[in-house]
Amino acid sequence: MIDRLVRDSRGPVTERNPPHMSLSAGPAEISEGLDNQRTLGVSPLISPALLRQELPVDAAIAKTVAHGRSSAVDILHGDDDRLIVVVGPCSVHDPAAALDYAHRLAEHAAGVRDELHVIMRVYFEKPRTTLGWKGLINDPDLDGSYAVNKGLRMARKLLLDISALGLPVGCEFLDPITPQFIADTVSWGSIGARTAASQVHRQ
C-alpha cells in the first residue's frame, strides 16, 4: 500500500522535485536519489603544486613580493612613515583591462614611492550574502560554467604579470584553499567583513 502511494505521488522529475525512491530500491539506487541533488557535475581540481610549477615565480617577482610585504610590515610597525594605499577595482573580471590598469598604476606609484606604499587591489572572488557572480576564479567566463581550473590559471598569471611590473598586489582570501594556489605572488592579504568571524580562518 505504501509502495503504491509512493509510486502514485511521483511528479515530473526536476531539480526541485527529485525522483522518489521505491521501498524495494537497492543501496545504489537509494544513494543516487539522495546524494548531490544540487550538484550538476564534478571536475578534478588542479593541485597547487602543479599550478605553481606551470606558472612559477621568478627571482624578480619574488623580490617584488618580498619587498611589498616587508614594506607593509615596517609601516604597520611604525618603522616607515609612509602610508599604505591599496587601490584597484572591486573585482577583476577582465585580466587584460586589469593589466592595463596595473601599467598605469605602476607609473604613478613610482612617482610617489617616498610618501606612499602603493599596492594594487586584485580581488578574484566575490563574497556573497545571497546569489550572484562569485568572481574570476570560480566563474572566469561569467556564464555559470564554473571552469575553476581556468580561473585559477588566469588569476595566477595575472598576479605574476602585475608583480613583474614591480607593483605589489593585494588579494582577499575567502577560504584557506585559494591561497595555496596564489599566496606566493601576494604581498598583502585581507580578510573581508563577511569572513572576519570565520572559524576556518582563525584556525
Curated annotation (Swiss-Prot):
It catalyses: D-erythrose 4-phosphate + phosphoenolpyruvate + H2O = 7-phospho-2-dehydro-3-deoxy-D-arabino-heptonate + phosphate. It is an enzyme of class 2 (transferase). It comes from Amycolatopsis methanolica. Residues 1-28 are annotated as: Disordered. Its EC number is 2.5.1.54. Transmembrane segments: none annotated. Pathway: Metabolic intermediate biosynthesis; chorismate biosynthesis; chorismate from D-erythrose 4-phosphate and phosphoenolpyruvate: step 1/7. One of its GO terms (cellular component) is cytoplasm. Gene3D superfamilies: Aldolase class I. GO terms for biological process: amino acid biosynthetic process; aromatic amino acid family biosynthetic process; chorismate biosynthetic process. Stereospecific condensation of phosphoenolpyruvate (PEP) and D-erythrose-4-phosphate (E4P) giving rise to 3-deoxy-D-arabino-heptulosonate-7-phosphate (DAHP). InterPro entries: Aldolase_TIM, DAHP1/KDSA, DAHP_synth_1. The gene is aroA. GO terms for molecular function: 3-deoxy-7-phosphoheptulonate synthase activity. Belongs to the class-I DAHP synthase family. Residues 1-10 have a biased composition (Basic and acidic residues). This is Phospho-2-dehydro-3-deoxyheptonate aldolase. The keyword Amino-acid biosynthesis applies. The keyword DNA-binding does not apply.
